[in-house]
């Protein structure tokens, strides 16, 4: 009882101190001791922007010659895996309301807009063999031109988790090396059509997130995982497929960057999400392996000096 009372008293004192600190901070703000945050609070040249992804906001899923992506199929077939059981058929309707969206960005004082291009809106069948969709190119030209008119820079992501369904049906998308050249062909169309106005390109958005959630847990399209995973998938191999997909993403990135540097060089980026792994005595080796896989597998390719062959070496 004495110990419990001491713990309760200690917790009460800590709570009181926290409340006092919050009141002190609020008083400082009211007294004007902390300057308000403004553009002057940031270094010269700092870019303020907003971002989106094509499937999450465009809508117009069956308009303008667009072909389906794996997310169309996933949301239609597995609405139970979507929190509100919605899909991207309409979404934010940016396909029709992009001028209003750009106007709001300008009103908010944004310097840049990072958006993704829908691969299947440019190549409805995923590859050059299926033909180029001029209506899709016109849509993105109109969006980019509207951004320029309002003084907003375009930061373009080429892939944000939305593999064309045609390529998923043809050879299982990023599980096949065939995706490398098809992705490069798609990227080159974008460089040719939009590169005179777009100076910032992002090859892949968070590649590890795509690989792990699409092929390990099955919670993202195309929803592949081993039977015992929480995604309750009908097909997949959580121990192999995420690494196969990541491998092909890295090769596609490398081929596209080589092409870009040789023919269209301005600047290129990749958006990565690194992970912090908690270490503990019981699972120290597992934590180390998880850290290497989630961070080194992809970071080492994009940043030099990287970890070299540590991922491959660790398998021993």
From Swiss-Prot:
Q: Name one GO biological process term.
A: carbohydrate metabolic process
Q: Which UniProt keywords apply?
A: Disulfide bond, Glycoprotein, Glycosidase, Hydrolase, Signal
Catalyses: Hydrolysis of terminal, non-reducing beta-D-glucosyl residues with release of beta-D-glucose
Which residues are modified by glycosylation?
A: 125
State what protein this is by name.
Putative beta-glucosidase 9
Which EC class is the enzyme in? Answer: hydrolase
Q: Which residues bind a beta-D-glucoside?
A: 56, 160, 205-206, 314
- Annotated active site: 206
Enzyme Commission number(s) from the entry:
3.2.1.21
Which family, according to UniProt? Belongs to the glycosyl hydrolase 1 family.
Q: Which InterPro entries match?
A: Glyco_hydro_1, Glyco_hydro_1_N_CS, Glycoside_hydrolase_SF
Q: Tell me where the signal peptide lies.
A: 1-31
Q: What are the annotated disulfide bridges?
A: 225-233
**UniProt GO MF annotations:** beta-D-fucosidase activity; beta-galactosidase activity; beta-glucosidase activity
Instruction: Show the coiled coil region(s).
Output: none
Q: Which PANTHER family match?
A: BETA-GLUCOSIDASE 9-RELATED, GLYCOSYL HYDROLASE
Q: Any transmembrane segments, and where?
A: none
The answer to whether the entry has keyword Glycoprotein is: yes
């Amino acid at each position: 009882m004495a110990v419990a009372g001491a713990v309760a008293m200690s917790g009460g004192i800590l709570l009181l101190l926290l409340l006092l600190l919050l009141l002190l901070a609020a008083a400082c703000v009211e007294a004007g001791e902390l300057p308000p945050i403004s553009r002057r609070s940031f270094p010269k040249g700092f870019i303020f922007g907003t971002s989106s992804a094509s499937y999450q906001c465009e809508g117009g899923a069956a308009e303008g010659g667009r072909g389906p992506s794996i997310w169309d199929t996933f949301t239609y077939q597995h609405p139970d895996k979507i929190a509100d059981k919605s899909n991207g058929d309409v979404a934010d309707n940016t396909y029709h309301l992009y001028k209003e969206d750009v106007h709001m960005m300008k009103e908010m004082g944004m310097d840049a807009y990072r958006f993704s291009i829908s691969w299947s809106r440019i190549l409805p069948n995923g590859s050059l063999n299926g033909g180029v969709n001029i209506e899709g190119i016109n849509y993105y030209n109109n969006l980019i031109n509207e951004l320029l008119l309002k003084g907003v820079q375009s930061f373009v992501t080429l892939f944000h988790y939305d593999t064309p369904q045609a390529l998923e049906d043809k050879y299982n998308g990023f599980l096949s090396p065939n995706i490398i050249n098809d992705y490069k062909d798609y990227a080159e169309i974008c460089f040719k059509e939009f590169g005179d106005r777009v100076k910032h390109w992002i090859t892949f958005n968070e590649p590890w997130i795509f690989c792990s959630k699409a092929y390990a847990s099955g919670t993202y399209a195309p929803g592949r995982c081993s039977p015992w995973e929480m995604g309750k998938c009908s097909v997949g191999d959580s121990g192999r497929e995420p690494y196969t997909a990541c491998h092909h993403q890295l090769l596609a990135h490398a081929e596209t960057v080589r092409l870009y540097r040789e023919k269209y060089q301005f600047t290129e980026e990749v958006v990565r999400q690194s992970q912090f792994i908690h270490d503990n005595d019981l699972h120290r080796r597992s934590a180390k392996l998880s850290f290497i896989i989630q961070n080194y597998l992809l970071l080492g390719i994009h940043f030099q000096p990287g970890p070299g062959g540590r991922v491959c070496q660790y398998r021993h």
